[in-house]
């Protein structure tokens, strides 16, 4: 996006999973939206979460709720935002060594702080569009308010407007910070 650093991830921010009550309220919002010429009247307060399209019938509970960045009550390209950046804030490394009675121990460490990564493995293994396997956790997706699953995995759907699997979103962006021992050596010097 123009005006932002190179390496930024740009997409939708996931803020939750749509419950049955959210769904019913979004349907009420859709009636108002359609009755007013595909827009909301000035000053209208949403009953439910903003959704991708009030004109389509593909809305369902269990879908991802997206952040309405533009505040217009409809999720569209104006609601994409910067989700993170691939470049870390800083990186570094250090090494150390110890010796004692013929034994020596050396270790090297590297670290990176800040920066994000897109987990494309999750992108494919939560996706119902592909021909690959899925995570076992995906079987415990949201089904209903009485069976919400045990995780934050949205309902499985092949509908492109609501399918969170097809959108680059905060759902797949993870912190890339790390602290790692990159090398460790233990030695012993034989006496002469």
What are the residue ranges of the model-derived segments?
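Outer-membrane beta-barrel pore domains and translocons
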Residues: 99, 110-112
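Repeated loop/turn-to-beta-strand initiation elements of outer-membrane beta-barrel proteins
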Residues: 102-106
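Secondary-structure capping and boundary motifs in well-ordered enzyme cores
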Residues: 74, 88, 177-178
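Outer-membrane beta-barrel domain signature
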Residues: 81-85, 172-175
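Extracytoplasmic gating/loop element in the C-terminal half of outer-membrane beta-barrel translocons
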Residues: 4-8, 58-61, 114-192
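Conserved small-residue
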Residues: 1-84
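Outer-membrane beta-barrel architecture
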Residues: 13, 95-97, 185-189
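Active-site beta-strand/loop architecture of penicillin-binding DD-peptidases
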Residues: 78, 86-90, 98
């Amino acid at each position: 996006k123009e005006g932002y650093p190179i390496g930024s991830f740009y997409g939708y921010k996931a803020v939750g999973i749509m419950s049955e009550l959210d769904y019913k309220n979004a349907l009420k919002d859709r009636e108002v939206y359609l009755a007013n010429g595909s827009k909301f009247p000035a000053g209208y307060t949403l009953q439910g979460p903003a959704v991708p399209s009030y004109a389509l019938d593909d809305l369902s509970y269990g879908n991802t709720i997206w952040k309405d960045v533009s505040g217009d009550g409809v999720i569209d390209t104006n609601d994409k935002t910067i989700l993170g950046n691939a470049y870390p804030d800083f990186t570094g490394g250090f090494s150390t060594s110890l010796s004692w009675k013929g034994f020596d121990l050396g270790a090297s460490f590297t670290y990176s702080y800040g920066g994000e990564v897109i987990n494309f493995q999750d992108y494919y293994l939560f996706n119902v569009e592909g021909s690959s396997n899925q995570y076992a956790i995906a079987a415990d997706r949201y089904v209903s308010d009485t069976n919400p699953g045990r995780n934050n995995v949205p309902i499985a759907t092949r509908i492109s407007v609501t399918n969170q699997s097809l959108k680059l979103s905060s759902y797949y962006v993870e912190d890339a910070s790390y602290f790692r021992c990159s090398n460790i050596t233990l030695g012993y010097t034989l006496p002469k």
